[in-house]
Design a protein with these regions (language model features):
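Conserved nucleotide-binding/hydrolysis micro-motifs of P-loop NTPases
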Residues: 58-62, 80-81, 240-242, 280-281, ...
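Loop/turn-to-beta-strand initiation segments
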Residues: 49-53, 230-233, 269-273, 310-315
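Glycine-rich phosphate-binding loop of nucleotide-binding enzymes
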Residues: 1-81, 326, 374, 404-406
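Conserved AAA+ ATPase "SRH/arginine-finger" region at the nucleotide-binding site
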Residues: 75-80, 95, 99, 335-344
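P-loop NTPase motor domains
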Residues: 59-64, 90, 94-299
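Conserved ATP-driven motor cores of ASCE-family P-loop NTPases powering translocation/secretion/packaging/pilus
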Residues: 301-306, 310-386
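Conserved P-loop NTPase motor module
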Residues: 369-426
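Conserved catalytic network of the ASCE P-loop NTPase/AAA+ motor domain
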Residues: 17-18, 43-48, 226-228, 263-268, ...
Length: 426
């Protein structure tokens, strides 16, 4: 971009320091935040071995403009994609249930208020581990895996065993008599929740697996798609993922990236950045009793604290920084702050900025569209900058209400919208 005080001077940021120390791009809706993200992505895409993942929550970075060299478009499978073969080759991503660790499966399936929850968690983990061990018999992984190991297994078989235990009768004290088994009736509600998940078409990307997603080799191909060194910027369209499991799904993807980096040898580790659009939806400050959001947050807290050691950079993008987790925000050493109109949001950013900025931070509500205050290790001095308009434009531009209302013909295809709403897919 260019400095607001001197438009003849070009403002630069140090790319190494920007991603090494994590960054935050914040701004109220309509402030030019999406343009700023597009500008960063455009510059990254020009690098020969750029490596980043952009979690696109609303599908605004999946427009035609973003289909250029250095940017690859993916989407989480919708109900209409489940029958597609070779999904990875068609840029369709499944997130199989067998990637979930013990805590994530509990958050998704277990009702903490159920008095039988401890028994349900114990027997479920035991059956899952038994099924995983069965799958690695005779391989190099035999006797080495845990319930958290990402090993493919058949969840339907686990459900069948749980149903059997829920109805089990065992020999009684008297000869020929029977009594209720130790888990009889205690797994009923858990089994019902699991059956509901398996039959929920919205969750098909996780539970409706074909043969290819049930193969152990699938994980290697999946990791290559997400993390290969010449992969460029991978935009993952998350717009059709159910909102109630969005934190879990994104947290799982982030955890996989971090874990693969952690287990890679240093000489073969290629740095990768995670760009978290609308981060306040899944890197939340206030979680209350939401187990799914809580477990998803853990991945980002760990990346914020330890990601630098393993070459994982984090870019938090949000219109409501006051709703973003403080632990994660406090680890960001670079801030690109566009106009913020909410007082709470302004105060959060002001508290995170250095004390010696003078009154520059007082201008957060006065900034023009696509104008930002940039502070941090990636810039020599705190600066007020007008961000260049990117050549690739997101589909989030402000809708011209008055102009559209004044047109002669502006019909909306409501039939198509209703059809998409019913089938939960565009």
């Amino acid at each position: 971009g260019k400095y607001t005080m001197d438009e003849s001077s070009i403002a630069y940021m140090d790319g190494d320091k920007l991603f090494q120390r994590h960054a935050a791009i914040v701004g109220s809706t309509g402030s030019g935040k999406s343009f700023c993200v597009a500008c960063v992505v455009e510059q990254m895409a020009k690098l020969k071995h750029s490596n980043a993942i952009l979690f696109d929550i609303h599908g605004e970075y999946s427009s035609t403009d973003f289909k250029i060299d250095g940017i690859k478009q993916y989407k989480i499978a919708t109900p209409g994609d489940l029958a597609t073969s070779e999904k990875l080759n068609n840029n369709i991503l499944m997130v199989p249930y067998w990637l979930l660790n013990y805590e994530e499966m509990q958050a998704l399936l277990l009702d903490r208020s159920d008095q039988n929850a401890p028994n349900q968690a114990m027997i479920f983990s035991r059956e899952v581990l038994a099924e995983k061990e069965k799958g690695v018999e005779g391989t190099i992984y035999e006797h080495l895996i845990t319930v958290d190991s990402p090993v493919a297994y058949d969840l339907q078989t686990v459900l069948t065993r749980l149903k059997s235990k829920d109805e089990e009768m065992v020999p009684g004290a008297r000869a020929g008599s029977e009594k209720l088994g130790p888990y009889n009736g205690k797994l009923t509600r858990f089994n019902q929740r699991l059956e509901n998940k398996l039959s929920d078409k919205r969750m098909g990307f996780m539970f409706s697996l074909q043969t290819e997603e049930k193969s152990q080799n699938w994980l290697k191909d999946f990791a290559r798609v997400l993390m290969k060194a010449d992969g460029g910027v991978k935009v993952i369209d998350m717009s059709e993922v159910p909102s109630d499991v969005l934190p879990l799904v994104i947290g799982l993807l982030a955890r996989i990236v971090f874990t693969v980096q952690q287990w890679s040898s240093m000489e073969h580790r290629h740095p990768i950045a995670l760009l978290c659009d609308e981060a306040h939806l899944y890197v939340q400050q206030s979680i209350s009793q939401d187990a799914v959001a809580e477990i998803g947050l853990k991945s980002f807290e760990r990346i914020a604290k330890e990601g630098r050691k393993y070459g994982v950079g984090l870019v938090i993008i949000s219109q409501r920084p006051s709703e973003v987790n403080r632990t994660v925000l406090s680890q960001c050493n670079n801030f690109i702050s566009l106009r913020l109109t909410n007082v709470d949001d302004q105060n959060v950013i002001k508290r995170l900025l250095p004390d010696n900025l003078g009154n520059i931070a007082d201008n957060l509500s006065l900034l023009d569209i696509a104008e930002a205050i940039i502070v941090g290790d990636a810039t020599l001095l705190p600066s007020r900058v007008k961000i260049n308009e990117p050549s690739i434009k997101p589909s989030s531009q402000t809708v011209p209400f008055w102009s559209i209302w004044g047109k002669d013909n502006s019909d909306q295809d409501l039939s198509e919208a209703i059809c998409n709403m019913i089938k939960q897919s565009k």
